[in-house]
């Protein structure tokens, strides 16, 4: 599912008419661009933490007016991402449905699912299933000392560290603004 959505995030702006998606700037966990009258299409001033003057950034956008597949793609992005144009890629003159950080999250999740699909086994517990991607010989000591849960939590935490550092540094320091290559 994540890989399919990731592909749709690239296909939607590529296959839509050029310049049909303007520069967006919404709020995470909110629907900002469903209709012409939605919050994101209003003018909220420049330089604020959320929103901008949409009329100065290409005009209004309503994903509900798109074909159903593109509407689903942009609608899911609208609900889950802030869609700030300066943090998003543009394809064919159209802003992508989610920011570069979310593209990285979907890519990492898709790669993890692929690795598990090729190497993992469905075992009795989540931690055993999670650790099944590693060769059994390298896991012998972990099982003998029953260190499965701490190892699983450590690996998961290690995977979240880059995202956490980037997100919290940006939140806590006004002088730091993450850029697309870092995301």
Regions found by a protein language model. Give the residues of each.
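Hydrophobic secretory-pathway targeting helix
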Residues: 1-19
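Small-polar-interrupted transmembrane alpha-helices in polytopic inner-membrane proteins
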Residues: 4-9, 79, 108-112, 145-174
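Interfacial helix-loop-helix junctions of multi-pass membrane proteins
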Residues: 16-23, 87-97, 164-183
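Extracytosolic (periplasmic/ER-lumenal) interhelical loops and adjacent juxtamembrane/interface segments
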Residues: 17-96
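Membrane-interface loop-to-helix entry segments
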Residues: 95-110, 183
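Membrane-interfacial alpha-helical segments at the cytosolic side of multi-pass membrane proteins
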Residues: 103-123
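Membrane-interfacial, low-structure loops and terminal tails that flank and connect transmembrane helices
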Residues: 123-149
């Amino acid at each position: 599912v994540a890989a399919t959505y990731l592909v749709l995030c690239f296909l939607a702006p590529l296959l839509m008419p050029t310049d049909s998606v303007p520069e967006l700037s919404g709020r995470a966990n909110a629907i900002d661009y469903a209709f012409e009258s939605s919050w994101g299409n209003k003018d909220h001033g420049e330089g604020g933490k959320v929103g901008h003057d949409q009329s100065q950034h290409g005009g209004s956008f309503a994903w509900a007016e798109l074909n159903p597949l593109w509407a689903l793609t942009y609608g899911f992005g609208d609900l889950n991402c802030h869609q700030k144009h300066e943090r998003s890629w543009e394809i064919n003159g159209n802003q992508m449905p989610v920011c570069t950080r979310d593209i990285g999250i979907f890519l990492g999740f898709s790669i993890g699912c692929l690795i598990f699909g090729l190497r993992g086994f469905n075992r009795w517990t989540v931690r055993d299933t999670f650790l099944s991607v590693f060769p059994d010989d390298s896991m012998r000591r972990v099982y003998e000392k029953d260190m499965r849960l701490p190892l699983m939590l450590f690996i998961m935490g290690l995977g979240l560290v880059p995202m956490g550092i980037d997100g919290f540094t940006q939140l806590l320091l006004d002088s730091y603004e993450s850029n697309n290559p870092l995301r």
